[in-house]
Each structure stands twice: as C-alpha cells, then as structure tokens.
Amino acid sequence: MISGKILRDAIISGANNINNQRSRVDELNVFPVPDGDTGTNMGMTVGASVAELNALDDSCTVGESAKTAASAMLRGARGNSGVITSLLFRGFSKALEGKKEADVADIVAALQKGVEGAYKAVMKPTEGTILTVARVASEEAAACGAEEIPALWDVVLTAGQKALEDTPNPVSYTHLTLPTKA
C-alpha cells in the first residue's frame, strides 16, 4: 500500500530528480519538435507542486496528495510537455480521489486514467512522445500481474525506459492502438 505521505514524498523526489536531470532530458527532446526544452518545462511543471506538497501534513491521504500535485502542476504547466505531464497527473489524481491509501490495482487504474485523460485532451496525439512513454508504461503495469508496489514500479520504470529509448523511431509505434477519444 502507498500512503499519502509516501506518494507526496515520491512526487517531491521525482520533481527534484527531473530538475537535477533537466539538461539531460532537454537533450532527449528530438521528436516531434527538437526544441530542447522538455526537461525545463517538465521541471517547472512538476516543481510547481513541491511547495504545496510540502505543506501537506504527514497524515494526508493518497487522494489528497495526488489532487494537490495535479492542481499545482496544472497551474504551473509550461510548454507542451509540461501540460501533458499535468494532464497525466490530473487523470492519476481522479482515479485516487477519496482514497486513504492505494494498492497495486489502484495505482494501475490511476496510471491508466492519467494516460486516457492526456490522450483525450491532446488535439493530435503524436506517438514517439511523452504520451507514448506514459501509455507503454501504463499498459505494462496493467499486464504485469505485480502484487506489490515496488515490483509494479520496477515494471513501470523498465517499460518507460524502453519506450523512451524508442521515441526517436516513431515507426516502432505504428502497430500500436491509440486510445480513442470519447
């Protein structure tokens, strides 16, 4: 199970990691527009949630942590990658709304809801982007059968890394089925 405190601390840690790796992420930004600002925009977006998350009490629920992060990211979103990141978190938070803690099934559902919401919100979703990385990680999470959160995160990280390595080659995504807009 993940508590609100654990989720809060994980998001803060992730924000710090993105900001520490900002230049490296900027260099990865080659498709569809090689403008070299993905790390900067994601760092600013996720970083916008840190102060509000730090203000949460250690007894916060997982739903409160997710909602706080998503709301702050939406307000602080910068650039396409930042907006998409905030949309992923918005869907993630909706799936955790009202939950005190989250188990593997809750996290898988939250990842799926985040991807679904982001694809629906983007007018022309392009494969080989942050959307693809999130979708592939979510699909692998749903299929892996993990029983514990650490095992689930290992699958998510491995799948995300593999999808990221494939992003410069959009042809590798031609066989994939895109989520449909409702």
Please name every model-derived segment.
Residues 1-29:
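N-terminal amphipathic/basic leader segments beginning at the initiator methionine
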Residues 20-25, 29-31, 38-53, 66:
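N-terminal cofactor/phosphate-binding cores enriched in small/glycine residues
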Residues 24-33, 58-62, 121-130, 146-153, ...:
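Flexible, glycine/charged-enriched surface loops at secondary-structure junctions
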Residues 33-40, 73-84, 176:
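Glycine/serine-rich anion-binding loops at beta->alpha junctions
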Residues 89-93, 97:
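Hydrophobic or amphipathic alpha-helical targeting/insertion segments
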